[in-house]
Amino acid sequence: MKTSQLFYKTSKNANKEASVLSYELLEKAGYIFKTAKGIYTYTPLFWRVALKMMDIIREELNAIGGQELVLPILHPAELWQKTGRWEAFRSEGLLYTVKDREDKEFCLAPTHEEIVSMFVSQWLSGRKQLPIHLYQIATKFRDEIRPRFGLMRAKEFLMEDSYTFSDSPEQMNEQYAKLRQAYQNIFDRLEIQYVIVEADGGKIGKGKSEEFHVLSSLGEDTLCVSGHYGANIEAAVAQPPQYTYDKDYLPIEEVDTPDVRTIENLQDFFSVPPYRIMKTLVVKLSYGEKEKFTAIGIRGDRQINLTKIGSKLNADACSLASDEEIQKHLGVEKGFIGPLNCPIDFYADETTQCMTNFICAGNVKDKHYKNVNWDRDIPRPEYADFLLAEAGDLCPTNNHAPYEIFEGVEVAHIFNLGTRYTEGFDVVFQDEQGKPQSCWMGTYGIGIGRTLAACIEQLADDRGIVWPKAIAPFDISILYNGGDTACEEAAEKIYKELQGYGYAPLLDDRNERLGFKLKDSDLIGIPYKLILGKTFLNSGMLEIESRSIEKFSVEPKDFVHWCKRHLPSPRVFSPIP
């Protein structure tokens, strides 16, 4: 393509609203246009990049037997009500809903488990059809409370989502492994640094779940990594430092503690380390339109993990209760909540099991108790892992080596769903005995916009975007001083030659000076620049400069050979098997 034909616009100045580098550069280089908060127009330049990434996705998924389809974006409410996710998503305000002229409710799809399950249930004729792998690349919607960071957290976004249906847990795991490897192949071809970590399934499902993260200081997710093992902090199982507690029980004491509310206050007041204090927090659990308040006990030196609590207690959502809610449901101020005489359900983190002679509140203002013990003073609660992992905690999966903490941008997520959706939608087959059995389902997704933004966050430099070669909008830009007839004629000849070999060059034919064109090419992120300037006019040699400032001097007769060595192979869209 020629620049004079390309509908695009670059800008010298950054958008003041662009709070992150990827958002700034995508707007500055003419890849996106903000239509409204969290809603963007994908420009022709952006779509060239997106199509190349989609082509890579299609190649890898078709290679493992994936079949592409297009599912509806508008979903009847009853499908989501059948799985309970209508209430779960609406309770967090994430679901866009509409009504038609017959007053029937629909939602704009944030995900497609329900509708693909209904489809397969109607078409599946027998076990011999299994496993099935269906995928689509489509627009999805989430009414984000705080849309921000450009494509990182938008209200409307582009995703690839895959769904597999199998006849057994073993076959489901085989499909999971195939999709996992296909996703690895996709990100390997993008040549970016990423990690795969264990994750919480959230509202999608409770089975095996992993996330793909591009490492970035922008990352909204915190990752715990130990050797080759990693986990999202929401799901990380960790062994915190262990401490020795008294063997003999001391008499329990009630102590006046006027206005002593925090762990730090208690440490100073009782002259004890924080791990000898039982901290109790109140969480609000949402179950559809219903709410429940529960108390969680944890060592005073640690923090609770709301995701683990919500998962353990099968809640749709979990958050810390407000001061007003605590006062209403417990009749006591924040800071004096404890397991003694607790008027609501009480659970405790498993690291508190060995605590003896600990200090805790008793749900009375300005009072605490010391030398409190399980069984004698408080019935033992149900224990579970409610711990938020920290750097230095030991990783039980990696021979108890310590965790390091990194930040990452989640770009893909894979799940084993089991039979949660297939049972509800009667996605069944007949086994050897002729009995109906529910299929075992998996779901997988890649955020295309998030991945492209994450590439920019990781690879960009002070001159602009640095796209991976495999997805750059053009393979090479051809640049010369506007008005230089000799260079213009040579550029036109090279441009046609490259097109003839199937490459995607961008010929900058604007009547602008060479320096201006060089800056635009770097900003846009084209991997190579072919520069026709003084060197070419004096010696006939072609100057080529990579985006990383690697320079080449090539004779015109060797240029095609150079292209075959350095440019991506001429691309065609992947054939459908």
UniProtKB/Swiss-Prot annotation:
Its EC number is 6.1.1.15. The keyword Coiled coil does not apply. InterPro entries: aa-tRNA-synt_IIb, aa-tRNA-synth_II, aa-tRNA-synth_II/BPL/LPL, Anticodon-bd, Anticodon-bd_dom_sf, Pro-tRNA-ligase_IIa, Pro-tRNA-synth_IIa_bac-type, Pro-tRNA-Synthase_IIa_type1. HAMAP family: Pro_tRNA_synth_type1 (MF_01569). Catalyzes the attachment of proline to tRNA(Pro) in a two-step reaction: proline is first activated by ATP to form Pro-AMP and then transferred to the acceptor end of tRNA(Pro). As ProRS can inadvertently accommodate and process non-cognate amino acids such as alanine and cysteine, to avoid such errors it has two additional distinct editing activities against alanine. One activity is designated as 'pretransfer' editing and involves the tRNA(Pro)-independent hydrolysis of activated Ala-AMP. Consists of three domains: the N-terminal catalytic domain, the editing domain and the C-terminal anticodon-binding domain. PANTHER family: MITOCHONDRIAL RIBOSOME PROTEIN L39/PROLYL-TRNA LIGASE FAMILY MEMBER, PROLINE--TRNA LIGASE. This is Proline--tRNA ligase.
